[in-house]
A protein has these predicted regions:
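Transmembrane alpha-helical segments of integral membrane proteins
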Residues: 156-171
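Ordered, amphipathic secondary-structure segments that act as subunit-interaction surfaces
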Residues: 71-120
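Interfacial loop-to-transmembrane junctions
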Residues: 167-186
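Small-residue-rich segments of transmembrane alpha-helices in multi-pass membrane proteins
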Residues: 56-67, 116-132, 155, 180-192
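Juxtamembrane boundary at the C-terminal end of a transmembrane helix
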Residues: 193-204
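Generic transmembrane alpha-helix signature in multi-pass membrane proteins
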Residues: 33-41, 102-106, 117, 125-140
Length: 204
């Protein structure tokens, strides 16, 4: 069975390639697109600190939930033949981790505004998507950790760039039918085209 195949030990090069590839080349927001909803739902006039708070919280949640979800899948679901419950188990795990993350992150970084991020974190499908990809490709724990960290950092980068782009076009005279979601989708599409320039980098 595919689930019982041995996973080769990754090298440091594999780790770095997985990190860079997921953050820039196979960006979960622009290329897949997973996690696009919190990107579009983020306040257009959001403060820089709040954008960084959302990016950091998403990165931490993706890393922790993907690693724990992988351990849960390999250690519990596969040995007991419960692979059909993987989506339910991962979804429950992702939701349950949001509250502890929003409890401990403000204590560790009191300067960042983490309040009110629950809906945006709950709507991020990147965690489930990454776990489904990992289970289908038989990825090891270290590779999955690098991919989840890269996916979170990639989301953080796109979120910051998208917020800057929103701030720049907010003062422009945009026709009424294009205001709001239409111009946001066009902006995200242009960013996706720009990120195609990273395709020349090595991929995993």
């Amino acid at each position: 069975m595919k689930d019982s195949l041995p996973v080769p030990a990754p090298t440091m090069t594999d780790f770095l390639l997985a990190l860079v590839s997921t953050a820039l080349i196979n960006n979960f927001v622009l290329q897949w697109p997973l996690g696009i909803d919190p990107l579009l739902q983020a306040p257009a006039d959001g403060a820089r600190l709040r954008i960084h708070a959302l990016g950091l919280a998403t990165t931490v949640l993706m890393l922790v939930s993907c690693v724990l979800g992988h351990v849960l899948y390999r250690g519990v679901l596969v040995p007991w033949g419960l692979q059909s419950l993987q989506l339910f188990a991962w979804l429950s795990l992702s939701v349950l981790l949001i509250r502890p993350a929003l409890h401990w992150l403000p204590r560790a970084l009191p300067g960042l505004p983490f309040d009110g991020l629950w809906p945006l974190l709950l709507a991020n499908a990147g965690m489930l998507g990454l776990l489904l990809i990992a289970s289908g490709e038989n990825l090891g724990l270290a590779t999955l950790g690098a991919m989840s960290l890269g996916a979170g950092l990639g989301f953080w980068l796109v979120l910051s760039l998208f917020n800057d782009l929103r701030q720049r076009i907010s003062t422009n005279d945009i026709p009424l039918p294009w205001q709001g979601l239409p111009i946001d989708l066009i902006s995200a599409g242009l960013m996706a085209v720009a990120f195609f320039g990273f395709n020349g980098l090595p991929k995993t």
